[in-house]
Amino acid sequence: MTRRDPMSMSTTWLAAAALLAGLCAPGAAWAQTQLRVFSGGTNQRPDLMRVLFDQYQKQNPGVTITIETGGATSELQRQYLSTVLNAKDASIDLYMIDIVNPAQYFGAGWLEPLNAWFGEPAAALKPYLPVYATSNVIDGKIAAMPAFADAMFMFYRKDLLAKHGVAEPKTWDELSAAAKKIQAAEHNPNLQGLSIQGAPIEGAVCTFLLPYWGQGKDFNDAAGKLTLDKPAAVRGLTQWLAMVDAGVIKKNVAEVKTPDTVNEFKAGQVVFAINWTWAWDRFKDDKDSTVAGKVAVMAMPTMPGGKSATCVGGWQWAMSAFSKHKAESAKLIKFLVTPEASRFLAAEGALLPTYPAVYTDAEVLKNVPWFKDAAGVAMAGKSRPMSRDYGQVSDVIRTTTSAVLARTKKPAEGVDEIDSRLRRVMR
């Protein structure tokens, strides 16, 4: 399907948006209100956020919303926002933050609790995907509200699986066997079986967690305390190395970043690829994509006897504790986290809905038919560790995972390091 111009929103959306904006009807209190919003980087689609902001401004002519963007990755955004918020900068009212950030930022006193505007956490977050009831609630306070979801999916070349009579693999060993069969039959030395992210970036946190969770294990308990099962973690890392040795994963996997996986998959050089939701549009719409119409998604494989699980990410709207326009900012957040906003972002940007019901919305499925297969994955997904020291947690997991994949550390050595360093942080 061809992406529609975001400005040509359906009349249904416009009517709903106007009604919702009307709840915040203009008045004297809104005169000359200047709101500044940090809306992330390119992957967070500031162009679509601008459409939402423009619609809000039309209904509230006393409000002007300015967008600030920056940081191509979650890590760079976290570094920038930590600097701004630590300085108690009041110039930015709202922030779009990663799902792992509420605990860190709220714990530091940087975010305004939203209970006064949204009510009790359980009721406020009940309509959304289950993961937000834990990720966005800190010490009984609503630290942020869901903007749009994200998740790691197993993308695959449905044409190649059909051509070679291969069924969707359910375990990592089955995937390895399927990939090797297709690689051998295609006689293409440049065809990778599976692409994962092994560079020391945020994606490597999920690279560590996927085969670990796939054994039915949890990394931490509800209170955030580390519950690492070391033998299971070693098995997970060993699984990746076995797939490297089998020629399924490329040998320089420790250098592979998120865009590398996207670019190589859309160039037709990969059979299976793990990546975030936004990659779908790149495969489908980019002019240089050779795989448009040839891609499908499936549940993340498991280890033997395990249960499928994936990394659920996503982006949240949070209010700065230092904002001078808190009431106005809260009204804007209410507008941005409605089912109508979720529907718009899903239909126009293939951004995963935060509301389960939107996955089956007819208009959304007309534009993004693969969402019918995404709902179960998103509902059963897990969040990366929730910690007020998430920056340190992330650094330990991703750098150690990358070192193991580079074979500068053995799996058991890497797991021992993760356990010893994080047991002091996550307790």
Model-predicted segments: where are they?
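Short, well-ordered beta-strand elements
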Residues: 32-43, 63-68, 93-94, 143, ...
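Extracytoplasmic "Venus flytrap"/periplasmic binding protein-like
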Residues: 55, 59-128, 137, 159-170, ...
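Conserved C-terminal helix/tail region of periplasmic/extracytoplasmic solute-binding proteins
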Residues: 162, 184, 245, 376-427
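Short, solvent-exposed loop/beta-turn-alpha elements that line the ligand-binding surface or hinge
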Residues: 115-128, 186, 192-201, 215-235, ...
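Glycine-centered hinge/linker elements that transmit conformational signals in sensory
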Residues: 178-181, 223-254, 300
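Extracytoplasmic/periplasmic substrate-recognition and gating elements
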Residues: 59, 64, 142, 163-164, ...
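Long, aromatic- and glycine/proline-rich binding clefts that accommodate carbohydrate-like moieties
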Residues: 131, 135, 293-299, 347-399, ...
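Hinge/lid segment of periplasmic solute-binding proteins
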Residues: 99-151, 187, 192, 204-207, ...
